[in-house]
Amino acid sequence: MSSKILSENPTELELKVAQAFVDLESQADLKAELRPLQFKSIKEIDVNGGKKALAVFVPPPSLQAYRKVQTRLTRELEKKFPDRHVVFLAERRILPKPARKARKQQKRPRSRTLTAVHDKILEDLVFPTEIIGKRVRYLVGGNKIQKVLLDSKDSTAVDYKLDSFQQLYSKLTGKQVVFEIPGESH
């Protein structure tokens, strides 16, 4: 069970999710895909309506393996943890912008910049659905709201989670975002 968790001192919630992983691994059709999968940590975040969201942070190299079984795994974990939306995110590192005075050691890769990491978090949040467009609205006070347009073909799978996605992204990055599915009126 603790072989599924990569952190040294797992919390009670992480142990419960690891146990759920082990239980799901006992099913023959998921066994091969779930055996190598591990996660680093889990954050439980309160969202609107008294619901909670579980953000499961996974190592970036194993994200592709998670994507293969993510829809099924999410469905099964949401059954085991009712009133919680489950989201899988890669745990990415943001390197600080190099100071002008600092000696140039190594160029900071684009994948470690704040913008790139926040964009990847957005893609991970809405995974089965694709992002088809982004718009930025500037408010009078100088605040920005990012409007994210999602593909309408997967709208039934993600529609009920849009508020959770919005709250999660806001808590993780501090940026305001609005998710919209074109062709639907809200």
Curated annotation (Swiss-Prot):
One of its GO terms (biological process) is rRNA processing. It comes from the Eukaryota. Its main location: cytoplasm. One of its GO terms (cellular component) is cell surface. Coiled coil: none annotated. The keyword ATP-binding does not apply. Pfam families: Ribosomal_S7e. Keywords: Cytoplasm, Ribonucleoprotein, Ribosomal protein. GO terms for molecular function: structural constituent of ribosome. It is found in: Cytoplasm. Belongs to the eukaryotic ribosomal protein eS7 family. Component of the small ribosomal subunit. Mature ribosomes consist of a small (40S) and a large (60S) subunit. The 40S subunit contains about 32 different proteins and 1 molecule of RNA (18S). The 60S subunit contains 45 different proteins and 3 molecules of RNA (25S, 5.8S and 5S). PANTHER family: 40S RIBOSOMAL PROTEIN S7 (PTHR11278), SMALL RIBOSOMAL SUBUNIT PROTEIN ES7 (PTHR11278:SF0). Component of the ribosome, a large ribonucleoprotein complex responsible for the synthesis of proteins in the cell. The small ribosomal subunit (SSU) binds messenger RNAs (mRNAs) and translates the encoded message by selecting cognate aminoacyl-transfer RNA (tRNA) molecules. The large subunit (LSU) contains the ribosomal catalytic site termed the peptidyl transferase center (PTC), which catalyzes the formation of peptide bonds, thereby polymerizing the amino acids delivered by tRNAs into a polypeptide chain. This is Small ribosomal subunit protein eS7. It comes from Candida albicans (strain SC5314 / ATCC MYA-2876) (Yeast).
